[in-house]
């Protein structure tokens, strides 16, 4: 679990997301509260439950990006799901309990990777020894003592191996054969039995070994992973992962507005209301069975988001509304925001296109007036057609640099200056013609 302060979390989010300070503050406080709760002693810790967040705002303003960046900062089991992918129990489709099962999978994967890193050095030493045993077989009939000459040769080869001088040489090694992935389709509600069957069948032939001819660099990676797997305790990993998912897990539910229905609608919307009712016990606290064991959801943080164009947060069932006490509204983006997205973010579109074309020795030089004009056109197109927020910049940039991208090999060694005139020449007519901008931009 991350111990970053709210200020540090917001500062990190600022590198990738422009504006939306209230949403950033809300998720930063929620994340910090997870750490604060862990510091509370005694029975009171169990009584402190997370305050779930509902983010409301139009498309393309940063809701999903906040979730993506939060996942990297959290250092905790994190999963992002689309509310529209789930159906009410009894209908064909995924049920909401699969959210927690997926979170458990993520927690186990994260814990295993963490444990593997701890034993990496020992695993690499063991892998080196196995490769050296193939390169320099021990003398037959040896009484266990290594002759001085062989020891010197072994150390010389170990040095070459570590310096990468042997990476391209071929070697034959015995490795554990990877288990084939077995997919078993089971009826809804029988997921636990399906997992047990899959686990049982996957045990067959799991210890088979076969000889493979590989480059030493590939063999080193394969053997290191194999040796690391021997050094970690799988049962301990599962136990710690379940506890981590229960205490620190974060679930981000996108498109929650798509399962909110207006009162006058009917028909297929019955299933949508059913999804809300099925989500309710998860959010307020229940126990879900996974292949690793039972997970209690009482302390899992839920963050939901939606544009709410055709519905309102009040169209969610009242019980679910009450489970998301913190509501933050994200604002539509202005021209200045578009400019900041293009110039100030850590991996802005400008930097991405410059890096892509630099691979063909083409230098893209964006002048401030050109970027301002580009931001204005993106904003105007959003105003006149559908407002898709910052995603409009990707469309406009692709159109702007279409010619340069196509002729990059011919322009090798040249500098292309993107100024106001260049932007107008390629985009002004399209942006002024509403029909063209609707279909092209």
Curated annotation (Swiss-Prot):
Q: Does the keyword Chaperone apply?
A: yes
Location (main, coarse): cytoplasm
Q: Which SMART domains match?
A: AAA (SM00382), ClpB_D2-small (SM01086)
- What positions does the entry give for ATP binding? 18, 60-65, 254, 319, 391
| GO CC terms in record | HslUV protease complex
Q: Name one GO molecular function term.
A: ATP hydrolysis activity
User: Per UniProt, which keywords does this protein have?
Assistant: ATP-binding, Chaperone, Cytoplasm, Nucleotide-binding, Stress response
Gene3D superfamilies from the UniProt entry: 1.10.8.60, DNA helicase RuvA subunit, C-terminal domain (1.10.8.10), P-loop containing nucleotide triphosphate hydrolases (3.40.50.300)
Q: Where in the cell is it found?
A: Cytoplasm
Q: Which domain of life is it from?
A: Bacteria
List, in alphabetical order, the GO biological process terms annotated in this UniProt record: protein unfolding; proteolysis involved in protein catabolic process
PANTHER family from the UniProt entry: ATP-DEPENDENT CLP PROTEASE ATP-BINDING SUBUNIT CLPX-LIKE, MITOCHONDRIAL-RELATED (PTHR48102), ATP-DEPENDENT PROTEASE ATPASE SUBUNIT HSLU (PTHR48102:SF3)
What does the record give as the function of this protein?
ATPase subunit of a proteasome-like degradation complex; this subunit has chaperone activity. The binding of ATP and its subsequent hydrolysis by HslU are essential for unfolding of protein substrates subsequently hydrolyzed by HslV. HslU recognizes the N-terminal part of its protein substrates and unfolds these before they are guided to HslV for hydrolysis.
- What family classification does the UniProt entry report for this protein? Belongs to the ClpX chaperone family. HslU subfamily.
Instruction: State how it assembles.
Output: A double ring-shaped homohexamer of HslV is capped on each side by a ring-shaped HslU homohexamer. The assembly of the HslU/HslV complex is dependent on binding of ATP.
What is the name of this protein? ATP-dependent protease ATPase subunit HslU
Taxonomic classification: Bacteria, Pseudomonadati, Pseudomonadota, Betaproteobacteria, Burkholderiales
GN (gene name): hslU
């Amino acid at each position: 679990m991350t111990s970053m302060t709210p200020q540090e979390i917001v500062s990190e989010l600022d590198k990738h997301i422009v504006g939306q300070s209230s949403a950033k503050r809300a998720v930063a406080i929620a994340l910090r509260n997870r750490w604060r709760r862990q510091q509370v002693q005694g029975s009171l810790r169990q009584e402190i439950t997370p305050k779930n967040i509902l983010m409301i705002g139009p498309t393309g303003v940063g809701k999903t990006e906040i979730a993506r960046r939060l996942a990297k900062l959290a250092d905790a089991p994190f999963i992002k799901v689309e509310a529209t992918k789930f159906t009410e129990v009894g209908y064909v489709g995924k049920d909401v309990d699969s959210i927690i099962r997926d979170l458990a999978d993520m927690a186990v994967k994260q814990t295993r990777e963490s444990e593997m890193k701890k034993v990496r050095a020992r695993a690499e030493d063991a892998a080196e020894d196995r490769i050296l045993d193939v390169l320099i077989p021990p003398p037959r009939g040896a009484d266990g003592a290594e002759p001085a000459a062989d020891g010197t040769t072994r150390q010389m080869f170990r040095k070459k191996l570590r310096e990468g001088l042997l990476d391209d040489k071929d070697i034959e090694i015995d490795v554990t054969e990877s288990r084939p992935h077995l997919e078993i389709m089971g009826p809804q509600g029988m997921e636990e039995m399906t997992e047990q069957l899959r686990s049982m069948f996957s045990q067959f032939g799991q210890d088979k070994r076969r000889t493979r001819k590989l480059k030493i660099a590939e063999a080193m990676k394969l053997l290191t992973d194999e040796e690391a797997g021997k050094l970690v305790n799988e049962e301990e990993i599962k136990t710690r992962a379940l506890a981590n998912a229960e205490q620190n897990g974060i679930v981000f539910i996108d498109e929650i507005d798509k399962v909110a229905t207006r009162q006058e609608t009917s028909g297929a919307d019955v299933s949508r209301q059913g999804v809300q009712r099925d989500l309710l016990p998860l959010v307020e606290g229940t126990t879900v069975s996974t292949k690793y064991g039972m997970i209690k959801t009482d302390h899992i943080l839920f963050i939901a988001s939606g544009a709410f164009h055709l519905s309102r947060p009040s169209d969610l069932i009242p019980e679910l509304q009450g489970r998301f006490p913190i509501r933050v509204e994200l604002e539509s983006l202005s021209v200045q925001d578009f400019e900041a997205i293009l110039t100030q973010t850590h991996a802005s579109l400008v930097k991405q296109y410059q890096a892509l074309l630099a691979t063909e020795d083409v230098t893209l030089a964006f002048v401030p007036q050109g970027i301002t004009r580009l931001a204005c056109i993106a904003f105007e197109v959003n105003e006149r057609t559908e407002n898709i927020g910052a995603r409009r910049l990707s469309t406009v940039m692709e159109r702007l640099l279409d010619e340069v991208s196509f002729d990059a090999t011919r322009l090798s060694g040249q500098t292309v200056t993107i100024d106001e005139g260049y932007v107008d020449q390629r985009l002004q007519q399209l942006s002024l013609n509403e029909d063209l901008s609707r279909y092209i931009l």
